[in-house]
Amino acid sequence: AVGTILPAIAERLGINPAAIVASGGGDNMMGAIGTGNIAPGVITMSLGSSGTVYAFAEQPNVSPQASVATFCSSSGGWLPLICTMNLTNATGVIRELFDLDLDAFNALVEQASIGADGVSMLPFLNGERVPALPHATGSLQGLTMTNLTRANLCRAVVEGTTFGLRYGLDLLRQTGLQSQSIRLIGGGSKSPLWRQMVADIMHTEVVCTEQSEAAALGAAIQAAWCQSGEPLASLCDKCVSIDPASCTLPVAANVSAYQQAYQRYQQHVATL
């Protein structure tokens, strides 16, 4: 830590005059610390307005794919990361279109079958970074007179956004990053339905941390690290807790069904 904040600044900003001035970091770098992602073997996935997937690496394994950003971590290593531009912002647009609250939306998603009866959505409403399609727009494929339902459209947008994360996770795995489980954070992680979908599509166990605001927790842990000099790993062991009730395992039949739907997604992306 550099020291404590100047009294005049503390008064002007209305913050604790004992607040320390120390190194900081970006939201994903802090999210990594806040999920204990400070050593190889852990992958963090955030389901927010945008979606991110990242993992600690000891070396800068630069991917040939431009979609993978090889950031520095805030814990002394590297943080290969992918970021999609359309996640809960895309699902939110569909909710607003049908005037659904979150519970009603989730009920419709659950009502539809895996693969949304052939309906595929490329939810690139803001363009997209992963896949790298900055000028793309959103689109629907596979519509028929019988499958054009609210339930299928609701499921298609959730599946489509999650397939984007799978696309990015595959890019990270190609660089050698592996994990026995995915630590899920962000607003979408609160949905048991979405947790199961992530586990099935990624074919990996999913767990959440007890503190859902992982970036804020990470910033606090980093400040404690800078102030105390205690090893970061020790602080993470003390402060980062996994929520055992959130543990979600992939279901074999679902994994197979989602793989077929994901291949369809890949085929649609390849035409853009």
Predicted segments with their positions:
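Active-site core segments that coordinate phosphate-bearing ligands/cofactors
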Residues: 3-185, 190-272
